[in-house]
Each structure stands twice: as C-alpha cells, then as structure tokens.
Amino acid sequence: MQLNPSEISELLKSRIEGLGASTDVRTQGTVVSVTDGITRIHGLSDVMQGEMLEFPNNVFGVALNLERDSVGAVVLGDYTGVSEGDQVKTTGRILEVPVGPELKGRVVNTLGDAIDGKGPINTTQTDIIEKVAPGVIARRSVSQPLQTGIKAIDSMVPIGRGQRELIIGDRQTGKTAVAVDTIISQKGKGVTCVYVAIGQKASTINNVVRKLEEHGAMEYTIVVAAAASDSAAMQYLAAYAGCTMGEYFRDRGEDALIVYDDLTKQAWAYRQVSLLLRRPPGREAYPGDVFYLHSRLLERAARVNEEYVEKFTNGAVKGKTGSLTALPIIETQAGDVSAFVPTNVISITDGQIFLETDLFNAGVRPAINAGISVSRVGGAAQTKVIKKLSGGIRTDLAQYRELAAFAQFASDLDDATRRQLERGKRVVELLKQPQYQPLQVWELAVSLYAVNNGYLDDVDVAQILAFEKSLKDHLKAKHAALIQRIEDTKELSKDDEAELAAAVQDFKKHGAF
C-alpha cells in the first residue's frame, strides 16, 4: 500500500479543521428553547455550574442545570430578545457584582447596575455573589451591641454585631418598619447598611428610599432592589448580591448590617426557577435544597477575628474585627410559624422577633410579642446600662400577660395582683414607639429606670408617653452632663444613679406630672 503525500496533507488538513470546530463547540452553544426566562442550550460542554453566559444583544444568564446533552440556564433581565437558534458563549466567570464604598447612597439592581437615575457607579472592584462563609476558626463570639433604637428590642431582644436575628410576622405587622428604624439608628455609628428588597412593589421600595433620605441614612446605605416586576432569577439572586456588597466591609475590619426584605419571596422565586428547570418538587412544591438556599446565605453573616481581617487585607488592616449583622424578614400566613420556610429560617438564625397582628391592631406598635421573641446570643452583647435596667421588664410583661387573661373572669383581685396588672399596663404603654424615631442609649436607660423604680406607677396610663417625653426634655435642659456621661460610658454608676433619681423626683414634684 502506497501513501500519496497529497492524500496525507488533505487528511491532516481535515483533522485540523475538525479540531478547531470541536474546540469552538465546547465554549459556544445554541439556544434550543426559551420559556419564562429559562433557556435550554445545546453544545456548551465546558460550562461551569453558576457560570455567566453571554447571549446576543448584551444579555447575560446563569447556568444552573448541567445535563448530559443540554444546559438549563436562567436569563438575567429581559428574556424577550432571546430566541431559538441564538448563539450563546461561556464567559469563564462566575456571576459577579461591583463592590466598594462607591455604592453607598445608591439604588442598584441584582447585577449592581444603578437604577436611581444618578449616573453610573465609579467602582473598579467586583466580587462573586456565591462565596463560602467564614470557617469556625475565623470567627469571634458576638460581644458588641448593635443598637436598633427600638425600646422593646434593645431591652428584651438585644442584637449583637455579627448576629442573625429573624423578624417574622404576618403581612402589615410592621416588619419593614423595624428594619428601617434599625438602619436609621446606625447614623454616626460607623455601620454600613445594605437593604435588599426582594419581590416588593416598586412604589414600596421608593417609599423606603425616600424615608432613608429624609433621615440622612442613605449616605451610609446601599439599596439592592429586585422588584416584583423583575424576573424570578433576579429576585432569587438579589440576596446573594447584597450579601457580597456587605461582606466587602466585613472583610476589611468594618461593621455592616444587611436587611433581607423578605426571604419568603426569595424562596418563592427560587421555587419558580426550580420548577421551570424541572427539578423534582418536595414539601409545599419547594425543591429539596431550599434549606441550603437560606443557610448558605445567612451563614455569611458573622463576626470575624483580627487574624482573618489581617490575612484578607494582606496586613493593611491590623487589630480590627469585622462584622456583618443580618436581619432576615419572613412573612407568615395567619401566624403559622410552623410552615416550611419559617421553621427553616428560625433554625438557622440566632433568635427571632415575632410581630403579631392582634397587638398591631390593638395599637401596640412595634407589635412585638415578648413571650416568644428571643435573642440567643445578643445578651452577651447588650449594653451594660440597658442590661442592668431591663431585667425586670420581660418578667413584668410576662406576668401581666398571664394575669390579664385571668383578670377578665375575676371580679375581685387582691392588691398584689392589681399592682402587677397596673405595672404591666404601664410597661406595655412605655414600649410603644412612633416610627422613624429610634432612641439613643441614654433615652432608653431613663425610660427603663423610671418604670423599674415605680416612678410611673401613679401616672395615668394614657399619659405615659407624654410623661416620658417631658422627662427627657427636662433632663436635656437641666442635666445635660449626666445624659452625656450615660451615652459615652454606656454605664450607670452609683453617683449617676443618685443624680438621675433626684432629677426624676424633682421633675415629678415641679413638672407638669
């Protein structure tokens, strides 16, 4: 058998041409179908799980299902321009968002693009949205307080920096109000805030941004908005994008606070994406990994130690701990906290603040049920003066709730029971607080001191809040040094306590009450 040189060259040429084509096929594919923002792509044999894909007309997607002969991907943004037969390219990158201090004061979408009409964001740094949470060795215990400025929370359910505290309740019980008040309360405290709005009406998000601007809170806040009109994929990924933006500050030895409003809608969006990708449904039609959806997100909120920060910054920041505090919000249906998603998130977080419709309708706002609200780690981080003064509040409230139920049926009550009921009524009234008015530490300390020491026992229940306001005005006018000391030291020394007692007695004697 003789080989013709021309045949050999032709054979090699065809082999080389075929080699080039096969290499191209591995990084380029064809859209087979498009349905509700989900595309099925053939030919992307080199794609990674979670990789960004480039569609025509500068549209991007994320590969979520890697199957034998096709890839299931979600389109981020408008999918109406994507059609069958379009060419799709791999990018070799996991989904990233811009990070850095330049984002403060801006409203961005899930991809970090500005949507507030104030022009592009000038940041050069980006980071991936899916990251592994810090390990056990990298963490520090929660020991620094994060003041919410809300009387009921700071006294009974204290939150520490690096904690995950769930806010749970039915619709229209004031969940967002608690979170927004907490953001406003961080003014001047060196805490960067991230507010992630998931599946909300655009008008509602606009109202929150406007309120934050009114109270000067937008200058240290980033708003990540995935409105109800955005695709399910954008809503599901928004929480991870916001978390990455908050982690930027945590990893550099700073403190950050992130609010997820709310994770129920994120779970709904993820369920929608999973069902469209034809993943097998489980309980309540959620996919099997819905617990992991929330656990991998909330575990990224942590207080990290000095070694972690120093290693991350290559020695640029030394001797500083960083923290990311998370306030996830969950919406329940008819108070059912034993549903699938609420029980998942309760088990992941370090405590929960439970808001009740009945209390809200009765005018107790914030409508916090102190009996079943708990902070598992915040006690160690509570401000000393508040810890000292708030011990009796929860007990008074618990006894009042118990006795109030019996008092409805009993006609004659003994004096001790009557006193407890009267004290309880005053505690409930004192813990009421108008929205957008978070308190400073000294204001909360004075209120707790007055109720604990019986100074409110002879004040009419309807006059409690007016008494509290007048007392604070009196202290501002005549005892400015005292309240400044309490605010600075966060403690109540014996001398200061004696001065405070004298000041309250003087106010009661010569004031309007």
UniProtKB/Swiss-Prot annotation:
Q: Where in the cell is it found?
A: Cell inner membrane
In the bilayer, the protein is annotated as: Peripheral membrane protein
Which PROSITE patterns does this entry report, sorted A to Z?
Answer: ATPASE_ALPHA_BETA (PS00152)
Gene Ontology CC terms: plasma membrane; proton-transporting ATP synthase complex
Entry-linked InterPro entries: ATP_synth_asu-like_sf (IPR023366), ATP_synth_asu_C (IPR000793), ATP_synth_asu_C_sf (IPR038376), ATP_synth_F1_a_nt-bd_dom (IPR033732), ATP_synth_F1_asu (IPR005294), ATPase_a/bsu_AS (IPR020003), ATPase_F1/V1/A1_a/bsu_N (IPR004100), ATPase_F1/V1/A1_a/bsu_N_sf (IPR036121)
* Uppermost EC category: translocase
| Residue numbers marked as site, Required for activity | 373
Which EC number applies? Answer: 7.1.2.2
For this UniProt record, give its keywords in alphabetical order, as a comma-separated list: ATP synthesis, ATP-binding, Cell inner membrane, Cell membrane, CF(1), Hydrogen ion transport, Ion transport, Membrane, Nucleotide-binding, Translocase, Transport
Output the superkingdom of the source species. Bacteria
Cite the binding residues for ATP. 169-176
- Identify the main location: membrane
Could you cite one Gene Ontology molecular function of this protein?
Answer: proton-transporting ATP synthase activity, rotational mechanism
Q: Reaction catalysed by this chain?
A: ATP + H2O + 4 H(+)(in) = ADP + phosphate + 5 H(+)(out)
Q: Which family does it belong to?
A: Belongs to the ATPase alpha/beta chains family.
The UniProt entry, under HAMAP family, shows: ATP_synth_alpha_bact (MF_01346)
Q: State its role.
A: Produces ATP from ADP in the presence of a proton gradient across the membrane. The alpha chain is a regulatory subunit.
**Assembly description:** F-type ATPases have 2 components, CF(1) - the catalytic core - and CF(0) - the membrane proton channel. CF(1) has five subunits: alpha(3), beta(3), gamma(1), delta(1), epsilon(1). CF(0) has three main subunits: a(1), b(2) and c(9-12). The alpha and beta chains form an alternating ring which encloses part of the gamma chain. CF(1) is attached to CF(0) by a central stalk formed by the gamma and epsilon chains, while a peripheral stalk is formed by the delta and b chains.
Annotated protein name in UniProt? ATP synthase subunit alpha
Tell me which species this is from: Bordetella parapertussis (strain 12822 / ATCC BAA-587 / NCTC 13253)
> Which lineage is the organism of this entry classified under, starting from the top rank?
Bacteria, Pseudomonadati, Pseudomonadota, Betaproteobacteria, Burkholderiales
